Amino acid sequence: MKPKISFNNVVMRYGGFLALDRLNLDIADGEFVTVVGPSGCGKSTAMNIAAGLLQPSGGEILVGDKPVTGPGPERGVIFQQYALFPWLTVRQNVEFGLSVAGMSRVKRREISDHYLSLVGLTDFADALPKALSGGMKQRCAIARAYAAAPEILLMDEPFAALDALTRVHMQDQLLDAWSRERRTVMFITHDVDEAVYLANRVIVMAARPGRLDQIIPVDLPYPRTEAIRLSPEFAAIRNRVWHAVYHQQPQTDQQSSHGQ
């Protein structure tokens, strides 16, 4: 089976700074991959290259068998910031891309109804974003991304600004949507528990310059539940990922984290 996303010797330089050094990674169709690593290791840079928002200095990235040369409708992007249009209602935000594409009002309504229901926002369809909590705004952003029917979702720390309980709820909402439609997901996070809970595989990136350090499989069944979070199997994988990330930290960061 051909990978859905392929990073082939991807290099990214900013002036004299090497942000990514020969990144090689394949992500399968329908796979949910999380990417972790120390700050500055190039996680977001890799995602922005996959989104077509940045052009690599070397190498290439393929979606299917086509090189990525810019943004495309087969890739939906969700950032930490909610990026909703404040003057549009929740439904209008979800339907925005469909409207731009010239889809009929009836078809747009059918699609927005489906995805608003999927993320639990049916009762807020006519509300403006200012009336929503942070978690609800991000659910709206997820519904909008899904409504555009991308084959791939690229998510850059989408839950980082949420409180702990809302974050857990959003993880479950996202997994529920993913389990129904099996889009390919590349999810950037600094949260090791989140990385393990969501993923089929956890990609650990090495520090400065960014490159692939190791891939850790998450052999836990779906649907993921609170019981899985509390299981010894989860703890074992979490500890493996945590140690992999911790040992990528620069020595000065490790010392400061111990109060030295």
Swiss-Prot record:
Family designation: Belongs to the ABC transporter superfamily.
E.C. code: 7.-.-.-
UniProt keyword Nucleus, yes or no: no
Native source species: Brucella abortus biovar 1 (strain 9-941)
Superkingdom of the source species: Bacteria
GO molecular function, one term: ATP hydrolysis activity
Its biological purpose: Probably part of an ABC transporter complex. Probably Responsible for energy coupling to the transport system.
Record protein name field: Putative ATP-binding protein BruAb2_1123
